[in-house]
C-alpha cells in the first residue's frame, strides 16, 4: 500500500518537473534577463563594501546570489529607528534571532537596507554587542579572507571607517588570527555574549562561515544614503 502511494507521488513529481521545464523553455528570453541582473548587481555592491560576491564565493562561504537592489529611498533616522531596532548615534541596529550562515545573514541585513554590524568606535562596539542575545554567538561584519591571508594580518570590516579590529575583545589577546580560531575554513568572526553575571567572559572568535548563528545588522544613515 505504502509502496504504491510513494510510486504515485514520485511519478507525480516527475510530471511537475516536466511541466516546469516546458514553461521555462517556452519563456524564451527570461533566463537571460535574470542572469544579467544578478551579474550587474554585485558591481554596485563593490562601491560600498570592503568585500563583494567574489570573496563570498570562496569555499568557506555559501555561494548565494544577492537580491536585486531595491530602488532605495532616502533613510531618515535622525529622530527614531523603526520599531524593534536599537539606536546608537546615527545608526539603527537589528538583532536577528534566526539562525543563519554568514552569507545568508549578510543577505538578510542587505534586504533591510543594512549591513552586518561594523564598529566605528569601541564605545559603539561595547554598547551594541551588549544587546545581542545572552549565551549566543552572533555574526558581525568582520571577515579574514583566505585569499588576502598573505597581505593582511587583520580581518576586514564590511564598511569603511571602522575601529582597528585588533582592539576589540578577542578571546585571546593580543590579537592574532590563529589563536582566535582562524583557519582557511574558519574565516568569519562572531561575537559571543556571555550571560550578564559573567559579562567579562564575552569574546570574539573566528568560525566556519557556514555555522548557524544569530547576527546583528546595522543601518548607518551616512552609509545607506551615500548609495544614491
Ligand atoms: C556611520 O558611518 C560613518 C561613515 O563610515 C561613520 O563615520 C560613523 O561613525 C558611523 N556611525 C556609527 C554610529 O556607526
UniProtKB/Swiss-Prot annotation:
Gene3D superfamilies: Mannose-Binding Protein A, subunit A
GO annotation terms (biological process): immune response
Disulfide linkage: 109-217, 188-209
A GO MF term: pattern recognition receptor activity
Annotated source species: Caenorhabditis elegans
Organism ancestry: Eukaryota, Metazoa, Ecdysozoa, Nematoda, Chromadorea
C-type lectin domain residues: 88-218
Residue positions the entry lists as glycosylated: 27, 220
Record keyword Glycoprotein present: yes
Recorded GO CC terms: external side of plasma membrane
Segments crossing the lipid bilayer: none
Protein name (record): C-type lectin domain-containing protein 88
Signal peptide: 1-18
Amino acid at each position: 500500500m505504502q509502496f504504491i502511494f510513494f510510486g504515485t507521488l514520485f511519478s507525480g513529481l516527475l510530471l511537475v518537473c516536466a511541466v516546469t521545464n516546458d514553461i521555462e523553455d517556452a519563456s524564451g528570453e527570461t533566463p537571460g534577463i535574470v542572469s544579467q541582473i544578478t551579474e550587474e548587481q554585485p558591481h554596485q555592491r563593490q562601491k560600498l563594501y570592503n568585500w563583494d560576491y567574489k570573496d563570498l564565493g570562496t569555499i568557506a562561504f555559501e555561494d548565494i546570489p544577492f537580491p536585486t537592489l531595491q530602488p532605495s529611498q532616502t533613510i531618515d533616522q535622525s529622530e527614531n529607528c523603526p520599531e524593534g531596532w536599537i539606536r546608537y548615534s546615527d545608526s539603527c541596529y537589528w538583532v536577528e534571532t534566526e539562525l543563519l550562515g554568514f552569507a545568508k545573514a549578510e543577505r538578510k541585513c542587505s534586504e533591510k537596507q543594512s549591513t552586518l554590524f561594523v564598529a566605528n568606535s569601541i564605545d559603539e562596539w561595547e554598547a551594541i554587542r551588549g544587546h545581542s542575545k545572552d549565551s549566543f554567538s552572533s555574526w558581525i561584519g568582520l571577515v579574514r579572507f583566505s585569499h588576502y591571508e598573505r597581505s593582511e594580518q587583520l580581518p576586514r570590516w564590511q564598511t569603511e571607517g571602522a575601529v582597528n579590529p585588533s582592539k576589540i575583545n578577542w578571546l585571546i589577546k593580543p590579537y592574532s588570527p590563529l589563536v582566535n580560531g582562524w583557519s582557511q575554513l574558519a574565516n568569519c568572526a562572531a561575537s559571543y555574549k556571555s550571560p550578564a553575571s559573567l559579562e567579562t567572559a564575552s569574546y570574539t572568535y573566528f568560525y566556519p562561515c557556514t555555522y548557524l548563528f544569530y547576527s546583528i545588522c546595522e543601518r548607518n544613515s551616512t552609509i545607506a544614503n551615500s548609495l544614491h
